[in-house]
């Protein structure tokens, strides 16, 4: 993997721009994940990984997941701890970042209709509660 050390690198500038600008995220159709758990959860998802960035120390800590992520991503880079701190939106950077492609769900919603959206319901009984509440509210 190639190592990026300078903050003026185009890849680093692009990731920082995605972090700070929702307009840029929508325009490019990309978003950034930060932190080991979020980034490595992508391994079990349908999201496409454009770029994977990791510090050498984080690579040692999460070696197995890092190898899998390098295979899943289109481009992978080592970054310095200093760059990781500069990129990070958190106080204590974990040194793991991924730039992923947004999914565009073209749902044909009809005006005047009512819809319920749920995500990751863990208890089937909760769906019944949601439906009953929606019915009660009209």
Segment roles from a protein language model:
Residues 1-65:
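Boundary-proximal intrinsically disordered activation/regulatory segments immediately upstream
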Residues 35, 98, 134:
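Residue-level signal for inorganic ion chemistry
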Residues 44, 104-138:
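RNA substrate-binding interface of SAM-dependent RNA methyltransferases
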Residues 47, 91-93, 111:
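Short connector loops at helix/strand junctions that flank enzyme active sites
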Residues 57, 101-105:
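Short loop segments at secondary-structure junctions
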Residues 65-72, 133:
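Catalytic-core regions built around general acid/base machinery
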Residues 69-101:
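Glycine/small-residue-rich loop that forms an oxyanion/phosphate-binding "nest" at active or ligand-binding sites
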């Amino acid at each position: 993997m190639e190592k990026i050390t300078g903050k003026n690198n185009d890849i680093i500038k692009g990731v920082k721009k995605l972090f700070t600008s929702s307009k840029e995220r929508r325009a490019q159709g990309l978003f950034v994940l930060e932190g080991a758990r979020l980034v490595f959860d992508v391994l079990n998802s349908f999201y496409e990984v454009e770029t994977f960035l990791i510090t050498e120390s984080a690579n040692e800590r999460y070696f197995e997941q890092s190898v899998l992520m390098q295979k899943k991503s289109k481009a992978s880079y080592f970054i310095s701890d200093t760059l990781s701190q500069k990129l990070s939106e958190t106080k204590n950077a974990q040194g793991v970042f991924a730039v992923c492609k947004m999914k565009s769900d073209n749902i044909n919603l009809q005006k005047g209709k009512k819809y319920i959206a749920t995500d990751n319901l863990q208890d089937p009984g909760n769906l019944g509660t949601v439906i009953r509440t929606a019915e009660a509210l009209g």
